[in-house]
């Protein structure tokens, strides 16, 4: 079928320029709005990838503007319950400012003590939050929260633009794949719910640096990303697994070393000045029970919550399952899968087994969907499920305060299940796409490379392959 031809073409001609309006039926239909698909005799990338990347960066302002407009009611009237849930304009950004004393500034955070800010965030985000919080002038709590939200809206807009740019730069022969980020409905819904886009942008920079053989910079960016949330650890593991198959572990040691040095340096600085603040988010995770978006919240909504230790064990088991699946995928596929493909499969397993799977966590999947080259059809089906769950979770929370107007728990669980199925389908689609590629010819010393992010592994033959019987 067309999907098979699409997959095979990327293997047999890995250097060909990919034009979505030619290869993706949905993109071809949508292109009619701006003049139709690229002509038969037109020269793809005639003006270079930078031109298209700049256009996509500009286009990314559209979902960001929609995300800001969605929060308009709360910006004007304040983030108050249950209205912020009925109007679906909740954001962790102003909530953290008000609840964690971020206005005291980064100096107070590093000084520690009873009056220090207490953001339950990993070290780098805590530093950024307190740094920006200290810039907010005195005023009423509502005005200060509004200003803080505005500052972070600008920062996250820049982070989204950088994510689009770095992704397009990682795919110089197929930069339009970054449109999956610039035009994603998932971004429009969740970009301003929390500061996750900071870590997403840092991870995109790390993947570009890896693909360009800039190992030290890749380690720095990836280390900083890990200091915003733990998901980038999956990318590091995926790179290591793919490198093991290629037999080029030496090229990865610099990356791993710089990642560890960066994490140790920033974490050590914060821990030296404020030990409690450095570990607060990790302690909070250990002590938390099942949260929204997680399948483990089902028993809680049914009136029989799982013990915290059981939820922690299930989440840890999810990480183990992700590592095992990632290793099998990376080492057992007929042809070496790409770094982004292994990362996406592992990330999906971690997300759907996590203690909580908040709406903004899906932002981490968006760049990977772009990098692996999924079609827009899969993207939009997934985005539809995300939108369904997005509305359901806020209406359920509103119903906690106003039961006769909110969403019953049973209907919320239906929306949650639909989202989990859609996210798992992304991993299935990537798995099938990678498994359909024919094995490399063992007689070729430098087999054609199908991974645009291969970096130092480009053209490497398999050194370790697990045969699947």
Residue spans for each PLM region:
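Perimembrane helix-loop-helix junctions
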Residues: 234-261
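Short acidic/glycine- and proline-prone juxtamembrane loop motifs at membrane-interface regions
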Residues: 191-199
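Specific aromatic-rich, kink-prone transmembrane helix
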Residues: 166, 199-215
């Amino acid at each position: 079928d067309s999907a098979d031809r699409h997959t095979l073409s990327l293997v047999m001609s890995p250097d060909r320029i990919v034009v979505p309006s030619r290869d993706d039926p949905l993109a071809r239909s949508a292109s009619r709005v701006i003049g139709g698909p690229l002509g038969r005799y037109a020269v793809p990338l005639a003006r270079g990838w930078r031109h298209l990347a700049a256009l996509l960066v500009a286009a990314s302002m559209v979902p960001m503007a929609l995300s800001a407009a969605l929060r308009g009611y709360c910006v004007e009237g304040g983030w108050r319950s249950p209205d912020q849930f009925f109007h679906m304009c909740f954001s962790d950004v102003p909530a953290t400012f008000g609840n964690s004393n971020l206005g005291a500034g980064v100096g107070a955070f590093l000084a520690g003590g009873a009056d220090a800010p207490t953001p339950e965030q990993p070290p780098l985000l805590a530093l950024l939050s307190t740094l920006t919080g200290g810039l907010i002038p005195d005023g009423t709590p509502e005005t200060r929260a509004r200003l803080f939200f505005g500052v972070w809206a600008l920062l996250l807009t820049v982070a989204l633009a950088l994510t689009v740019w770095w992704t397009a730069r990682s795919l110089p022969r197929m930069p339009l794949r970054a449109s999956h980020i610039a035009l994603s409905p998932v971004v429009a819904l969740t970009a301003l719910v929390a500061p996750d886009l900071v870590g997403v942008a840092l991870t995109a920079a790390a993947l570009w640096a890896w693909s360009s053989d800039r190992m030290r910079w890749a380690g720095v960016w990836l280390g900083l990303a890990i200091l915003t949330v733990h998901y980038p650890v999956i990318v590091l593991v995926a790179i290591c697994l793919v490198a093991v198959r290629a037999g080029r572990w030496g090229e990865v040691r610099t990356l791993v070393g710089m990642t560890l040095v960066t994490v140790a340096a920033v974490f050590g600085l914060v821990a030296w000045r404020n030990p409690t603040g450095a570990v607060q988010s990790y302690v909070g995770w250990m002590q938390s029970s099942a949260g929204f978006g997680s399948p483990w919240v089902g028993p809680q909504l049914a009136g029989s919550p799982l013990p915290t230790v059981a939820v922690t064990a299930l989440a840890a088991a999810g990480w183990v399952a992700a590592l095992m699946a990632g290793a099998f995928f990376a080492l057992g596929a007929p042809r070496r899968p790409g770094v982004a493909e292994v990362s996406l499969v592992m990330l999906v397993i971690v997300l759907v087994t996590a203690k909580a799977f908040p709406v903004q966590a899906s932002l981490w999947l968006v760049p990977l969907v772009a990098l692996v080259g999924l079609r827009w059809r899969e993207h939009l089906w997934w985005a539809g499920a995300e939108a369904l769950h997005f509305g359901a979770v806020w209406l359920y929370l509103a119903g906690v305060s106003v039961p006769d107007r909110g969403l019953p728990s049973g209907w919320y669980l239906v929306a949650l299940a639909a989202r989990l199925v859609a996210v798992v389908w992304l991993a299935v689609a990537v798995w099938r796409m990678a498994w359909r590629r024919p094995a490399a010819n063992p007689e070729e010393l430098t087999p054609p490379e199908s991974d645009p992010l291969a970096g130092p592994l480009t053209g490497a033959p398999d050194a370790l392959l697990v045969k699947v019987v």
